[in-house]
Design a protein with these regions (language model features):
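Active-site metal-binding motif and surrounding structural segment of the metallo-beta-lactamase
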Residues: 1-25
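Active-site neighborhood of phospho(di)ester-bond hydrolases with catalytic His/Asp-centered motifs
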Residues: 1-5, 25-28, 85-88, 145-149
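Short acidic active-site motifs
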Residues: 12, 216-221
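Catalytic core of the metallo-beta-lactamase
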Residues: 40-105
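Structural motif
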Residues: 59, 83-86, 144, 177, ...
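FMN-binding flavodoxin-like domain, especially the glycine-rich phosphate-binding loop
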Residues: 97, 101, 107-146, 150-152, ...
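Terminal amphipathic helices with adjacent charged low-complexity linkers/tails
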Residues: 144-175
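Short, charged N-terminal beta->alpha structural module
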Residues: 181-202
Length: 340
């Protein structure tokens, strides 16, 4: 049974067919098309449809198509007699399994951040299809989740936590914390980042993560952005554009349709400011609540710029500690379109 055609899952299919020529390969229509496309295998295939069932003696296999979680052919296979679901990449996690495979053999909390990192990097773009898949599976009684990445979840509390985490992530819900991601060439933009962070901490934000995009892995930055509701991005002007690492991060967030965030942005320049324009355009394209005017430093730190940075930290802290919901900022062009 092929739940997912990505080569990290199907790389052994050709070998299996060579060793067992009469083997039957079970998949849905898109799977069988890809099987032929990737490996030239078209014989001995068994086509199944959404909600279909296949008897294998004492047990049955039930198939649930979950397209775009995170490829178009993805599906899950459920064994009702055992109440076990083979979920493909869904509910997956990064991280090695060092000895134990079952959640009873490991420390489950070790994999929570790795599950968020996996979701944000691999599945993060597909929040709506994940929600559709969760609704489709909501009526199943599940004793074990067997993902293709990470531990096998068998403890009822762990199963509930895993499903709840995917539900929250796919709704872009997040914890009350702050991510500050920035690029800096000479230290000026970094100084602004540190001022904002210290002021947010003074005003009650206890979960603050700072990422220098030149030093942090983007994989880790994406994890934290999906984890926390507050996001502030800073960049110097670089050849009339954003700092390359910041530009890459902004592109990655836009590609994942991130929403439901309190957002601020800041930057620095020497003679021509384009940071505000580029980050402002990014903010306008996302469903963020922009908390203050951008903080922009020309050449060096002045007292008024420092105070604006502190104000950004204070306002973000108030948003995160007050329990307020995100209200997406309406821009003039959007307001005109809404009236139409």
């Amino acid at each position: 049974v092929i739940n997912h055609m990505e080569p990290d899952h199907t790389g052994a299919v050709e070998w299996l067919v060579s060793q067992y020529p009469s083997i039957k390969i079970v998949g849905n229509k898109r799977t069988i098309e890809m099987l032929n496309g990737f490996y030239g295998i078209a014989d001995n295939v068994v086509l199944v449809e959404d909600g279909g069932e296949l008897s294998i003696g004492k047990n049955r296999l039930q198939f649930f198509l979950t397209p775009m979680v995170h490829w178009p052919e993805t599906m899950m296979t459920y064994i009702p007699e055992k109440k076990v679901i083979f979920s493909g990449d869904a509910f997956g996690a990064f991280g090695t399994l060092d000895g134990g495979v079952l959640d009873t053999q490991i420390l489950p909390e070790r994999y929570r951040d790795e599950m968020i990192r996996y979701y944000s990097n691999i599945v993060g773009k597909f929040g709506s299809p994940v929600q559709t898949a969760l609704k489709k599976l909501s009526g199943l009684e599940i004793n074990a989740i067997c993902s293709t990445h990470g531990p096998v979840w068998t403890v009822p509390e762990n199963i509930a936590d895993v499903v709840n985490l995917y539900d929250r992530l796919s709704r872009y819900d997040a914890d009350s914390g702050l991510v500050i991601a920035y690029g800096s060439m000479y230290g000026n933009t970094e100084e602004l980042a540190e001022i904002i962070a210290s002021e947010a901490a003074r005003n009650g934000v206890k979960s603050i993560v700072m990422h220098n995009v030149s030093k942090s892995s983007q994989s880790d930055i994406l994890r934290d952005v999906f984890k926390y509701k507050g996001l502030i991005i800073g960049s110097p002007t670089y050849n009339s554009k954003l700092y390359p690492g910041v530009e890459s991060l902004v592109s990655a967030l836009d590609n994942r349709f991130l929403k439901n965030r309190f957002f601020g942005y800041f930057g620095s320049f020497s003679w021509s400011d384009t940071t505000a324009r580029h980050l402002g355009a990014f903010a306008e394209g996302m469903q963020f609540e922009v908390i203050t005017e951008p903080v922009i430093m020309k050449q060096g730190m002045l007292s008024d710029v420092e105070e604006k940075a502190r104000e950004m930290g204070r306002v973000m802290a108030h948003k995160l500690t007050s329990g307020a919901g995100v209200v997406p900022t309406i821009y003039p062009t959007q307001a005109i379109n809404n009236k139409k």
